[in-house]
Amino acid sequence: MAELKVTAIKEGTVIDHIPAGKGLKVIEILHLSRPNGGVLLLASNVHSKKLGKKDIVKIEGKFLSEEEVNKISLIAPTATVNIVRDYGVAEKFNVEIPDEIVGILRCANPNCVSNHEYVTSKFYVVSREPLKVRCHYCERTMEESEILSNL
């Protein structure tokens, strides 16, 4: 088995255990297509004992907000976030899908009040596996494909 060689980052975040093929979506929802001069690395289809294949995203000079971690949980509920300081892992945690998703997802119902009024979107998690959420306002249930296209 070939060894994966990736340059270490001094400060930043490593998102590991992303299901294979979803790393680009993580980069997209975090608006990282143009990093602030730091390293942005996507390793795709890397061997994983846990998942078989996985993606890894390394972001130099960026630490994730709670909202960003919640977004990642909707795309990659198996992901692990590593906070790197002075070339070492200072903190490590698994993402968790919150019970309520507030302000980060649009309702797929074009007639929903959240798409026409100045109200913050709000969804309740109905199921984590498979992922399903229900809109607080119109009660529409959305499944993973709709969730991903409305982030």
From Swiss-Prot:
Cofactor(s) needed by this chain: Zn(2+)
Keyword Electron transport carried by entry: no
One MF term in the entry's GO annotations: metal ion binding
Keyword annotations of the record: Metal-binding, Pyrimidine biosynthesis, Zinc
Role: Involved in allosteric regulation of aspartate carbamoyltransferase.
Subunit text: Contains catalytic and regulatory chains.
Name of this protein: Aspartate carbamoyltransferase regulatory chain
The gene coding this protein: pyrI
